[in-house]
């Protein structure tokens, strides 16, 4: 796939050089020396400078990077967004589960932090889990869940689910409905798909809004210790991941999208999610494919470029700003994508 240059620039951690055809990719947000840089020629890009020798092997000899997925993986590998040591145990454990003749979901429960930007998990699963194909979904979070469901269904055909297995997962709604603060992304996901997720996928859908942190972690610990269930905590909240790792011996998946603490999401990360959705899902609809809402940390309207988006609640003014940001997405990307 040849990706237009207008899309490649905002997808990763780059500076946009207006009026030129140059690009730079940095390893860290505050690095002075770019990881690599280059120029565009039509819809292709050429690397002409690599700042660090150890990353030179990541680039093709000819210097051309032909497609989005190829570039995405190289940038992720180079920038350290995915720690191989963190994934090795997960990949090995997951492989053992899917190769087991027994119905493995009786021992595994997924705990989803629904405020996470699930687009990033898609790349993780696609890269590290064999037999992983994307199935279209109208929600970014559900897109990943659907992938896992596909794997489960293929492995579990012909298997019988014991009654005690259903009893265990039937209790999820008690935990879920004790949440007093379901709104925004969580509410949209919950109220549109909760029955499907609970009954068909047997997935814990919990929020991480305030009290949700404790509910996820306590549920994670209880199931691991009392019910002998292995838990997979899917979150981009490093604090939750660290607490979960300290409190029980179960395994988990941790995926930090950024080094920004809490729910504050830099505008650059939001733009990255928007553009990734344009490719992955073939369309971008505000508050639908990507649920964006919240308060801006700066009051000056003209200073939005240096503000934050808080994924928490929504107002008309925030939606207007979101639509303004969305107007930057070239029209060619609407209704199209890598999988379209």
Task: Name each model feature, range by range.
Residues 1-112, 116-231, 239-340:
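Feature 3881 marks metal-assisted phosphotransfer/nuclease machinery
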């Amino acid at each position: 796939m040849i990706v237009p240059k207008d899309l490649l620039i905002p997808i990763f951690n780059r500076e946009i050089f207006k009026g030129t055809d140059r690009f730079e990719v940095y390893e860290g947000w505050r690095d002075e020396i770019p990881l690599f840089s280059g120029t565009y020629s039509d819809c292709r890009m050429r690397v002409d400078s690599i700042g660090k020798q150890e990353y030179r092997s990541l680039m093709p000899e000819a210097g051309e990077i032909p497609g989005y997925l190829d570039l995405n993986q190289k940038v992720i590998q180079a920038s350290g967004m995915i720690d191989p040591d963190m994934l090795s145990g997960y990949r090995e454990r997951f492989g053992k589960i899917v190769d087991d003749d027994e119905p493995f979901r009786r021992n595994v429960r997924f705990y989803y932090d629904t405020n996470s930007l699930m687009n990033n998990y898609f790349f993780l699963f696609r890269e590290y889990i064999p037999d992983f194909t994307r199935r279209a979904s109208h929600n970014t979070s559900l897109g990943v869940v659907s992938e896992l469901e596909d794997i489960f269904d293929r492995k579990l055909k012909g298997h019988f689910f014991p009654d005690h297995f259903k009893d265990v997962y039937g209790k999820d709604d008690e935990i879920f409905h004790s949440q007093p603060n379901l709104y925004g992304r969580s509410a949209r996901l919950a109220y549109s798909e909760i029955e499907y997720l609970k009954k068909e996928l047997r997935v814990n859908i919990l929020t991480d809004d305030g009290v949700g942190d404790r509910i996820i972690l306590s549920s994670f610990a209880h199931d691991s210790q009392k019910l002998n269930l292995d838990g997979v905590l899917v979150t981009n909240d490093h604090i939750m991941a660290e607490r979960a790792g300290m409190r029980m011996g179960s395994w988990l998946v941790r995926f930090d999208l950024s080094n920004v603490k809490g729910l504050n999401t830099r505008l650059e990360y939001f733009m990255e999610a928007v553009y990734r959705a344009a490719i992955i899902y073939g369309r971008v609809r505000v508050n639908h494919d990507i649920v964006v809402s919240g308060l801006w940390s700066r009051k000056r309207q003209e200073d939005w470029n240096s503000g934050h988006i808080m994924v928490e609640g929504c107002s008309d003014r925030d939606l207007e700003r979101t639509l303004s940001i969305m107007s930057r997405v070239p029209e060619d990307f609407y209704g199209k994508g890598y999988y379209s």
